[in-house]
């Protein structure tokens, strides 16, 4: 059996973040919680999410692989109000996942399961020379700035600065987070630099994988030269990790 | 002659509710107020509205049939601000209806009359086994839930419950209003059940005829098995009635 | 050299107002401030803006002609937040204008200069029989009313009234600002009439040139019979002037 209860707001955040990059996923359920990971269709980005049983109000789970059409689940979850109680409940016999929203009215959706087998994908254990922690709002704004001039951007760590840089045929854009400057907002919350490095990424992917963040969420960004960027953040106890391959400049 | 004054907000609501289903209508005006009824172009739904003279600040009306392009009237009415005074005034000679908004500025529209003759349609006097009163907001949300899985829905009354149900090829949706459960919000304000019954309707029509309701409006819904559904509500003293034919399942 | 600092909000307003009608412009910079004027591509409207050095927090300017793609500049300026500090700074060597937004983060754009030579256009010195001052919000609403019935409108001054009038095949619209009526809001702030007159204009242009006004901005409108209309307004010390040729009715 599998049955879990939580608040709608948190589950919505986790599902939205995951579904921006992948279309279907296999929830690997067991007594400890829900895990899932998947690559985007073009195998450039990897998404991994972990919802330990502690984030649920009630949780009971045997071992199950629950294959889900994320697009359909996202639309259903979007129908829930933030303060409604959300109940997930596997109907093994009918091969369906029931999603129930409970307030003074009971609204129940049944969603057919997909034949998605568990991927056993793991986020590779890479050693990164640099990492920074940054508020998601400021990072997303820098991506929007870069979007005005080109469709790829360069993330640089150099001389006490984290720089988001983009250059088009005519114009260019640059956002500088300077670790040496007093920053009351703690926009750049952490800055750990091993060696100067830079990598270039597809902007659309970076936008997709940060689309569901809230402005105050802290993103932990791991960076090296011509290495995949790793971006981690937490949503009320659930953990999201994204890995994006660099664009190798010819 | 015909000349009537009211506040823009209320008239806007009545016109919007009516114009969601029909394109043209004949306002039957007399000393008691304005009445109109029309069928939608495919003859599946009937709309009827009644604005008694008491809802107007000033009202003077001889007997007139005023044929109106509802789409044009709706756009004009949309230009009025809620707290402006609205004056309707028939220019028999020029065959136009003048619509004037008055605040510190005077804005006057003249709209050409259509050759729509009075339909003398009446809402048929059907005996219904069941009726419920429900807040429009909750009903509209249930329609949106249903929309995720199919384009028609089933309204059921059974065992102290009013159920809105939809089933697609893969997924299904169900909203249950349970008369037996304490409901502080009075979402289900009344529940009068004669016999268990169910009918299926085109979802797009139900959405159209509830599109202009406010969340707190009370809809009175009359329901039987394979019978048209009748939905009534009031807007500041004006009465709106909708009748929608059931979808006969093959 | 040219370097100027101001708040983002004001500069955004001036650039938006200018860029609604023209695509490129030459900023004529000198020690007194920035001036620019341009005609729209179809030579029906003339736009002129003046930002004296007093509107800037800091200002230093030698004589320069700075040709700008207004569409690109508008998009960049749109990325600034209202309360950020904006720094304009000419890089003569690289032939670029740098636009920097400064808050706790520094965001810098470089925009390539265009080869737009100074136009030396002047707003012609026409004597107008009438002028009115009117709140932009009320004027824009009247344009929207007119838009429902036709794509051109007539501005009339007659008998203590300023009238915005439009007539379509079926319907018509008329907004009357009556100088004789007490108007607590001072919507019609001034009314100076020399002789009754009327001119007809393309509605889309009038909408474009008032698109960036705020509801409370005072527009000074100069009007005669079959003459261009001149519309002036101020944005925090900067001056905007628009001239629009009349539509000669055949």
UniProtKB/Swiss-Prot annotation, chains A, B, C:
Leader sequence residues: none
UniProt keyword terms in alphabetical order: DNA replication, DNA-binding
GO molecular function: DNA binding; DNA polymerase processivity factor activity
A GO BP entry: regulation of DNA replication
Listed PROSITE patterns: PCNA_1 (PS01251)
Subunit structure and binding partners: Homotrimer. The subunits circularize to form a toroid; DNA passes through its center. Replication factor C (RFC) is required to load the toroid on the DNA.
Family as reported in the entry's similarity comment: Belongs to the PCNA family.
Functional note: Sliding clamp subunit that acts as a moving platform for DNA processing. Responsible for tethering the catalytic subunit of DNA polymerase and other proteins to DNA during high-speed replication.
Name of protein: DNA polymerase sliding clamp
Gene: pcn
């Amino acid at each position: 059996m599998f049955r879990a209860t939580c608040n709608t707001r948190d589950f919505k955040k986790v599902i939205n973040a995951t579904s921006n990059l992948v279309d279907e996923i296999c929830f690997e359920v067991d007594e400890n919680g829900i895990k899932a990971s998947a690559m985007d269709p073009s195998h450039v980005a990897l998404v991994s999410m972990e919802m330990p049983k502690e984030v649920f109000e009630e949780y009971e789970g045997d071992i199950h692989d629950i294959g889900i059409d994320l697009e359909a689940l996202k639309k259903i979850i979007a129908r829930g109000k933030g303060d409604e109680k959300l109940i997930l409940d596997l109907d093994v016999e009918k091969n369906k996942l029931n999603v129930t929203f409970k307030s003074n009215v009971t609204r129940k959706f049944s969603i057919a399961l997909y034949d998605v087998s568990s991927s056993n994908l793991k986020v590779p254990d890479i050693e990164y020379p640099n990492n920074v922690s940054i508020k998601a709002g400021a990072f997303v704004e820098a991506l929007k700035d870069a979007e005005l001039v080109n469709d790829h951007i360069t993330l640089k760590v150099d001389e006490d600065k984290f720089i988001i840089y983009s250059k088009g045929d005519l114009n260019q854009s640059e956002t500088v987070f300077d670790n040496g400057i007093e920053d009351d907002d703690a926009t750049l919350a952490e800055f750990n630099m091993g060696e100067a490095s830079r990598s270039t990424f597809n902007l659309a992917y970076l936008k997709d994988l940060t689309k569901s963040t809230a402005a105050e969420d802290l993103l932990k960004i791991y960076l090296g030269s011509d290495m995949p960027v790793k971006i981690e953040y937490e949503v009320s106890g659930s953990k999201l990790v994204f890995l994006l391959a660099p664009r190798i400049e010819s």
